[in-house]
Amino acid sequence: MSAAALLAPAPAPAGAPPAPEYYPEEDEELESAEDDERSCRGRESDEDTEDASETDLAKHDEEDFVEMKEQMYQDKLASLKRQLQQLQEGTLQEYQKRMKKLDQQYKERIRNAELFLQLETEQVERNYIKEKKAAVKEFEDKKVELKENLIAELEEKKKMIENEKLTMELTGDSMEVKPIMTRKLRRRPNDPVPIPDKRRKPAPAQLNYLLTDEQIMEDLRTLNKLKSPKRPASPSSPEHLPTTPAESPAQRFEARIEDGKLYYDKRWYHKSQAIYLESKDNQKLSCVISSVGANEIWVRKTSDSTKMRIYLGQLQRGLFVIRRRSAA
């Protein structure tokens, strides 16, 4: 039998209903639809299985994460407890490291403090020695100055006493008590015997100095010149002293003080300047001007360091003459 005969439909029997017509395209479509449905069901089943497995895996991972987190917490807690125990025992490495650093800082500060204390102590000792030397020097200077002032004061009193003695010698004759000249009459027979008159000797007059030394000396020289020639003058009177050109009353010198300086004989003199001082008795003294006041100057002798006070009036009248050492 040929293939065409095999493929041809069999003839229907008689009296049978007619067979339906057969279309091969429709069968293929039905088969493809069934295949698609079966594949779709298979895919859905696979997806459901996959979803279930993923859910189980997620749950398992979450449990593992929680367990791992708990383990990390326990490890961290145990580490902290161990570090706390080491800290209490003093064996913690970080604690020892920081303690070593603090100890170094402490020793450094102690060393700096000791150096600062030593420096301050040396500075205080130097200041103490310096102040002590200054105090000793000031004490010695004040002592010398006090001694010089006392010597000058005593010299001044000595001069006043000598001037007073000289004044008493020059004016002694005027203070003598002269007897009263009375006429004696003859006593009558009936008159009582006269009682002698007892008179007290008048006390010597007291001298009150209201003038300066140079004015007193000038008055004494004037009185000495006017005194009577019958009474011999004492050798110590100014009349027997050798006269110098400086004692001439007609010769006067210009002397004044301005701005702490002395202007004398057309020259300026200042403090601490070396001079020669010539007095009325031809004494020539080497002196140094100690100070310049308002109306007088103080000079210090270089021989014994005693001080003398010279008034402007004495310089103007020529009782003392000042010359520079270089020009003298």
Swiss-Prot record:
Residues 2-170 are annotated as: Mediates interaction with USP17L2. GO terms for biological process: apoptotic process; chromatin remodeling; negative regulation of transcription by RNA polymerase II. Residues 10-21 have a biased composition (Pro residues). Residues 64-171 form a coiled coil. One of its GO terms (cellular component) is nucleus. One of its GO terms (molecular function) is histone deacetylase binding. The modification Phosphothreonine is found at residues 49, 244. It is found in: Nucleus. Residues 1-64, 226-252 are annotated as: Disordered. Polyubiquitinated. 'Lys-63'-polyubiquitinated SUDS3 positively regulates histone deacetylation. Regulated through deubiquitination by USP17L2/USP17 that cleaves 'Lys-63'-linked ubiquitin chains. The modification Phosphoserine is found at residues 32, 45, 53, 228, 234, 237. Residues 23-37, 45-54 have a biased composition (Acidic residues). InterPro entries: Sds3. The modification N-acetylserine is found at residue 2. Keywords: Acetylation, Apoptosis, Chromatin regulator, Coiled coil, Isopeptide bond, Nucleus, Phosphoprotein, Repressor, Transcription, Transcription regulation, Ubl conjugation. Homodimer. Component of the SIN3 histone deacetylase (HDAC) corepressor complex. Interacts with SIN3A. Interaction with SIN3B enhances the interaction between SIN3B and HDAC1 to form a complex. Interacts with HCFC1. Component of a mSin3A corepressor complex that contains SIN3A, SAP130, SUDS3/SAP45, ARID4B/SAP180, HDAC1 and HDAC2. Interacts with USP17L2; the interaction is direct. Interacts with FOXK2. Belongs to the SDS3 family. Regulatory protein which represses transcription and augments histone deacetylase activity of HDAC1. May have a potential role in tumor suppressor pathways through regulation of apoptosis. May function in the assembly and/or enzymatic activity of the mSin3A corepressor complex or in mediating interactions between the complex and other regulatory complexes. The C-terminus is involved in transcriptional repression by HDAC-independent mechanisms. This is Sin3 histone deacetylase corepressor complex component SDS3. It comes from Bos taurus. The gene is SUDS3.
